């Protein structure tokens, strides 16, 4: 199966994985399937020593693709299937046999935060941020993944207010290893 949303280029023992689902790299069912396929393949590649995950455009990943759910008639089991494939799309990164570096090129929101939190090392451009905006659409989610990175107080602030933690604060808190100019992120 070829992938169209999760792109992977390999050079010099580095797998550069790019989320390319315009306009905001939202997580659709196809996104989740391709993420699992790409990271499972990377785990089996002897010539790959590290993977770097980033997003195409101005957003790393804006979270769940709500638009893909509009107009769909729910069938029995849909909720559980969606939850399971979402979890697996995070676990394939956490369980990858190669270290995975997240290069936050822009905001990682909701499920996008979970993707970033699943990586082994995080770096960000000055435009990177992490947030849980679900409260703005009447939902509450993502806290489990945020708690792997943040303390209870900041996680609650993010969940209850939609606060986005900017790259400078992520660095100050020790969540990310470096902040770069946007044009230097992938160097």
Map each language-model feature to its residues.
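Crotonase-fold acyl-CoA enzyme core
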Residues: 2, 92-187
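A secondary-structure boundary/capping signal
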Residues: 20, 55-56, 62, 105, ...
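Glycine- (often His-adjacent) and acidic-residue-rich active-site loop
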Residues: 34, 47, 55-92, 108
């Amino acid at each position: 199966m070829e992938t169209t949303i999760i792109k992977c280029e390999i050079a010099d023992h580095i797998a550069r994985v790019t989320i390319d689902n315009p306009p905001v790299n939202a997580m659709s069912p196809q996104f989740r399937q391709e993420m699992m396929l790409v990271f499972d393949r990377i785990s089996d590649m002897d010539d790959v020593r590290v993977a770097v995950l980033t997003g195409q455009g101005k957003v790393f990943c804006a979270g769940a693709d709500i638009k893909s759910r509009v107009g769909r008639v729910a069938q029995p089991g849909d909720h559980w299937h969606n939850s399971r494939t979402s979890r697996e799309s995070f676990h394939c990164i956490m369980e990858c046999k190669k270290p995975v570096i997240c290069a936050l090129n822009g905001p990682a929101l909701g499920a996008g935060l979970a993707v970033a939190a699943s990586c082994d090392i995080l770096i960000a451009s000055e435009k990177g941020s992490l947030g849980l905006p679900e409260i703005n659409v009447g939902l509450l989610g993502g806290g489990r993944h945020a708690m792997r990175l943040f303390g209870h107080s900041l996680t609650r602030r993010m969940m209850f207010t939609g606060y986005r933690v900017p790259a400078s604060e992520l660095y100050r808190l020790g969540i990310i290893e470096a902040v770069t100019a946007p044009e230097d992120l992938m160097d």
